[in-house]
Amino acid sequence: MSSGEDLAADADRLEEESYRILRSRIDLSRLARFSRDVTESVIQASADFDYATDLVCDEEALAEAVGALAGGAPVIVDAAMVAAGITGCPVLCKIDEPLTQRLSRTAGISRAAAAVRLGFGQAGPGAIWVVGCAPSALQEILSRGVEPGFVIGLPVGFVGAAEAKDALRASGLPSLSNVSEKGGAAVAAAAFNALLRSAMAAAGTGGGR
């Protein structure tokens, strides 16, 4: 076994042990399948059991997101930190592109909002959006009418994050969010990875736990 394979095996063992500890401390068996997978993944990534009651999951919408991913829906993220946390799937992230900076200046909008406009222009309707950092990205998704296939809306912060997530839930768009100011790149990526594992398992390309 190569050193790379050793490291991968060690990472798998650590993750399995992490989930074992998690399940010994909280019972989420009351939740439906995809809601449970997402909630466990977020708690495992954050070591924060409050997410068991903070996340707002819609099982039917989560199932549709899994189906969309299995069908090859494009994935757009709001920040490089979110992209870095996603494994096994190509993602579109426009935040650091020069065109994003120019659009931000000329339109007088945040870079996150400009990145949403450019991402939508490239991917079109039906994409899976993953927002873990910028409330303004979530606000732009709602105001631009991007017709998402699904939105993971978990931006973090005391300024505008909870309000943006409230607006996402009020919009009726298929989504996953949380009630509090908590969130962030790691938990948004963890939620997405849980859905991706299910999609890969459904497509017969791996995944599952």
Protein language model regions, located:
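Electropositive, gly/pro-rich neighborhoods at or near active sites that engage anionic ligands
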Residues: M1-I76, G85-I86
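Short, basic, glycine/proline-bearing loop/turn elements
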Residues: Q44-T53, Q101-S104, G126-A127, F150
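Glycine-rich, small/polar surface segments that engage phosphate groups of diverse ligands
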Residues: P74-A115
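Buried hydrophobic positions in well-ordered alpha/beta secondary-structure cores of metabolic enzymes
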Residues: D78, I152-G153, A191
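Active-site regions of enzymes building and remodeling cell-envelope glycoconjugates
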Residues: C89-K94, G149, G172-S175
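Long, charge-patterned amphipathic alpha-helical coiled-coil/hairpin "stalk" segments used as oligomerization
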Residues: S110-A164
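C-terminal functional extensions of proteins
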Residues: V159-R209
